[in-house]
Design a protein with these regions (language model features):
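Glycine-rich phosphate-binding "P-loop"
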Residues: 1-11
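Short alpha-helix plus adjacent loop in nuclease-associated cores
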Residues: 59-80
Length: 229
């Protein structure tokens, strides 16, 4: 099944999904989504037999954003330090964004040196970076639901003082996030489709008429344009 919706509003998505029929909707066993609360309530409303799984990559993105925000805030902190420590912190943080966010095992030798400088200058960023790496590893290495759930609980305890916003969100979505350890489902395919849709929009210099865009998108994937609403 494929559905293209003109808006992200819940009622618009529901209208399209309702056209699939109750029989199809009742047979959906799992829905992978990002951390959007309205969509979760919609799934519960129209897909009674579906389990919701949060895409692990959206959760990881949230961690990255909070780490980067802490990096930016450290620049503000540096202004109130003495000249020597201020220069050390500023110099280490300059150009450090992608070094901090990229998986440590994938860093170049130069980036490893930069990471060492940042950790030396900012104990807080050092801890947050370590927690970021641990968070990534628990999704990569947990063999089953039990192990993944226990490791995530342990991570939440250690991270509560550093990733306050993320910890609150993960706690609120705990069941849906830990569902990944059991089913290993992500939105990877959908994200790939979205990237192609963005490319299509660029090639078409934008589409003012949604029906024209819908037909072009269906033809792009070799679906008959008769599927368009």
């Amino acid at each position: 099944m494929i559905g293209l919706v003109s808006e992200r509003k819940q009622h618009k998505i529901e209208e399209v999904m309702r056209t699939w029929g109750e029989k199809v909707l009742s047979q959906i066993e799992e829905v992978s989504m990002d951390l959007t609360g309205n969509y979760k309530s919609l799934v519960k409303k129209i897909c009674p037999n579906a389990e919701v799984t949060v895409d692990r990559f959206h959760v990881t993105k949230m961690i990255y954003e909070e780490l980067n925000q802490a990096r930016i805030e450290q620049k503000i902190v540096a202004k109130f330090l003495n000249a020597k420590n201020r220069a050390k912190l500023f110099d280490s943080l300059k150009g450090s964004k992608y070094t901090l966010l990229r998986a440590e095992k994938k860093l170049s030798d130069q980036q490893k040196i930069k990471l060492k400088e940042v950790k030396s200058a900012s104990p807080m960023i050092k801890i947050m970076h370590s927690l970021k790496e641990e968070f990534h590893a628990l999704f990569e290495k947990s063999k089953d639901w039990g192990e993944g759930t226990l490791r995530l609980i342990d991570w939440l305890k250690k991270a509560s003082s550093y990733y306050q916003k993320s910890v609150k969100t993960i706690t609120r979505w705990f069941a849906e996030i830990t569902g990944y350890f059991e089913r290993r489902t992500t939105k990877g395919i959908v994200e790939g489709i979205n990237n192609k849709l963005k490319l299509l929009k660029r090639c078409g210099f934008g589409f003012r008429n949604f029906n024209n865009f819908e037909m072009r998108a269906l033809l792009f994937w070799h679906f008959p344009k008769s599927l368009a609403h």
